[in-house]
Amino acid sequence: MELLAAHFVPSTRSRRRSHGQALALAAISAGFLMITLDATIVNVALRGIGADLGGAPSTAQWVVDGYTVAFASLLLLAGSMSDRIGARTGYLVGLTVFVLASAACAVAGSVAFLVAVRVAQGVGAAWLMPSSLALITHTFAEPQARRRALAVWGAVSGIGLASGPLVGGILVASVGWRAIFLVNVPVGLAAARLLARHADETTPRRRPLDLPGQLLAMFSLATLTGGFISAGAHGWTAGVTLALGISGVLGSAAFVLVERTVRRPLIDPDVFRDKAFTTVVAIGFVFNFCLYGSIFCLAVGLGRLRGLDALDTGFALLPMTVVTGAMALFAGRLVPRLGEWPVVAAGLTSGAVGATLVALNGSHAHLALLLLSTVPIGVTALAMPAMTGLAMASGPRLRLGLAAGVFNASRQAGGALGVAVLGTILTSGPGASVSLRRPFLLTAGAYGLAVALATLTSHEGTT
């Protein structure tokens, strides 16, 4: 009997552990799905929000970018705080803030209040994202299991970003725009309960906080983003545009200076000792610049160029949405066979092809041809899990929260600037006309640059 028990107990314990890991991953993924979905779900609701609450088109851009600017600029602090207080605690703090802010968004009575609570949503998302990566790395110690978990995490990101317009369109058409925020409340509560029961806490690691660096990072990103949005509303030579742009550049320079001189910088230079990590951080910036900007331009362009409402816009982007989800899942099987860098390069190359096709077919081609042109953009989701795996594998092992914060801050900063820059170019044609050609030509070029970086780094790693 003892031999029999010895034979079966490890198996039972293993099954229980696997079950607990699966539930922890479900909780992590549910929260992560909410924060990625909220980056794009609002795009198709902007017309309804404007009709209900009023506000200029440039203000509507801040409903999107208020979230992503706060998200991006606080990720570095949140990554450090995740190391200080433990990833599970950090995740639950972020989830609580995000759910409360979502409820506030649903009852907003003015655009100004909505932008303010969207910023609060971004604060919660900033806490949640690096903690989620650190929790996955801590929960799944075995490399193959971790790779599978990161593939799920990456797939959730791709599905959330791409399905935002469709989910938003359905909710706006059936219930109203406020429903896109209310849906986060029950999902967030369920995720918090699961995580508290099935995820172990990471070991807290105390270190001083770089508040001057954090404030400069927030100031720089907000003013640079505001400068691009102002350019679309008032022109490139307007006083407010120039003031915001110059402030952003000076703030960025001051941030670099502070980080080089402060004893405990917000971004520890040791994080960038590995060239692969530095490269994947740069590629992550370009990736989100292109993806967030593309989804924003497609959602706005389909409405203003083709006259589609929120629901029709969501369904129009369904081919891209389906391909995005499928590719994000498929990448988990492809990476073990080909390696991370080739998969990243393949996804980015497809993005360049798709952006070029949209630029050629966006304004005047048949709608069906335009929508088929978006499918290769969905294939870029191949790169998501591979990029994440590279970032977490090449970052410092004892600073996982900070490494995750740096990687995701770069991605979210790219997303915020992508919406601002490409959104401005979208509406800056003659007579303030809308054209998909200009923003998607820039997107294709940016994807091409990222392909070159990935290819060069891949070759260096094999020589």
Predicted features and spans:
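Transmembrane-helix bundle of Major Facilitator Superfamily
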Residues: 2-196, 328-330, 338-340, 344-352, ...
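12-transmembrane solute porter fold
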Residues: 21-46, 57, 226, 239-244, ...
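Residue-level signal for the membrane-embedded core of alpha-helical transmembrane segments
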Residues: 73, 127, 219-222, 293
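Membrane-water interface at transmembrane helix exits
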Residues: 83, 137, 199, 225-233, ...
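Hydrophobic alpha-helical transmembrane segments of integral membrane proteins
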Residues: 126-127, 161-162, 182-183, 193, ...
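Hydrophobic transmembrane-helix bundles of small-molecule transporters
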Residues: 151, 173-284, 290, 308, ...
